[in-house]
A protein has these predicted regions:
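Hydrophobic helix-and-loop "lid/oligomerization" segment in the mid-to-C-terminal part
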Residues: 1-7, 11-56, 60-71, 150, ...
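Short acidic, glycine/serine/threonine-rich loops at helix termini
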Residues: 12-14, 42-45, 86-88, 108-111, ...
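Glycine-rich, phosphate-binding/catalytic loops in enzymes
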Residues: 18-19, 90-93, 114-115, 171
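Active-site cofactor/cluster-binding pocket
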Residues: 57-111
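A generic local secondary-structure boundary/capping motif
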Residues: 61-64, 84-88, 115-118, 138-140, ...
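Short hydrophobic "helix-edge" motifs at membrane interfaces and signal-peptide entry regions
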Residues: 90-91, 145-147, 266-268
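Conserved beta-strand scaffold positions in the cores of enzyme catalytic domains, especially
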Residues: 96-98, 114-116, 213-215, 247
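Short alpha-helices
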Residues: 101-172
Length: 320
């Protein structure tokens, strides 16, 4: 089981849910985690300390010898090959299942055996939770499974405030009955002093552009830079007059991440697709390889401003 590299809580929760189903079927299962997953270190450490999950996690390259016709690769919370934790597995495992809640991109996993994409769903964790609910009475998530899935839903819905529907609350109720611990989830999301300062700094260096666009950057590589960028982008939407907020942040190596948010008036997914990413109309992101952060930031500003101008002109013509 694997998701996108630099996994977030939704990706991790969905992977844990799929692993739960695999164990219930008596199958050997592994979750591939990328080297860049500092944002979920706390919950990963908790799972690793539990003997019931021994040898569950592997790193990219650990399954280099796997090329079995009987193996099944389940991809969660992503479907674009180059952003996956270990894209080489796509070439060695013929049976591939995709479970995602993002709009289908042109760059898609080749020849999947099964595709389950539901863009109306709040999160991949919600989709996997629904599968668990109808999988059979013999499948019951553990407390850690349920908490991981619950945390994924909480993150992607911003505490059930964005994109949460009836099915979301049904899934959350099932997870609570299965032992999901909201207190533990809250503890997982607590920020230390350094993160709080970094978030304040990220907000302070943001730049406002005509049309309701804010663009900020985090040039230094931080252990939880992705989380800080997402929180900063979310926070800037509360500024009066802002319709779109985008943050560019440095990742490991020559990788640059982009976190985009909108109030709903603008479709940030369209902009992120231009950078090889995706998401939803009001929440999207991308990761760019081999490009300086300043270059990516400049291109983000150019594309976002052009999109806003075109969108406003189109709306003006329609109103006329």
């Amino acid at each position: 089981v694997m998701g996108h590299h630099n996994e977030d809580y939704d990706c991790f929760g969905a992977a844990m849910g799929v692993a739960c189903m695999a164990r219930a079927l008596g199958k050997t299962v592994h979750i591939v985690l990328s080297e860049m997953n500092e944002g979920i270190d706390r919950i990963v450490d908790m799972v690793q300390k539990d003997e019931a999950y021994e040898n569950l996690f592997v790193r990219p390259g650990d399954l280099a010898g796997v090329a079995s016709q009987s193996a099944v690769l389940v991809v969660v919370d992503a479907h674009i090959p180059h952003i996956l934790a270990d894209p080489t597995l796509l070439e060695r495992i013929p049976k591939i299942v995709v479970i995602d809640h993002h709009r289908r991109s042109e760059n898609f996993v080749k020849n999947p055996l099964l595709v389950y994409i539901e863009t109306a769903s709040s999160s991949a964790s919600e989709l996997v939770t629904e599968l668990l609910m109808y999988f059979g009475e013999n499948v019951r998530p553990t407390r850690l499974d349920a908490t991981a899935l619950y945390s994924g839903i909480v993150v992607d819905t911003k505490n059930f405030n964005v994109g949460a529907g009836v099915r979301t609350f049904d899934a959350a109720a099932y997870l609570r009955r299965s032992g999901a611990d909201p207190v533990l989830v809250r503890a997982l999301f607590q920020s230390d002093y350094e993160t709080t300062v970094a978030l304040a700094r990220a907000k302070a260096n943001a730049e406002f552009f005509p049309g309701g666009l804010i663009v900020g950057s985090i040039p230094e590589r931080l252990a939880n830079g992705q989380i800080i960028a997402a929180q900063a982008a979310d926070g800037m939407l509360r500024v009066d007059g802002v319709r779109m907020s985008i943050y560019v942040f440095q990742m490991a190596g020559d990788m640059v991440g982009i976190s985009a948010r909108s109030t709903g008036e603008m479709n940030v997914q369209v902009i992120m697709e231009a950078f090889g990413g995706g998401g939803h109309a009001n929440v999207a992101g991308a990761q760019v390889k081999d490009a300086p952060l300043a270059t990516v930031r400049a291109e983000v500003i150019e594309r976002a401003r052009a999109y806003i101008e075109e969108s406003d002109q189109s709306e003006s013509h329609t109103a006329g």
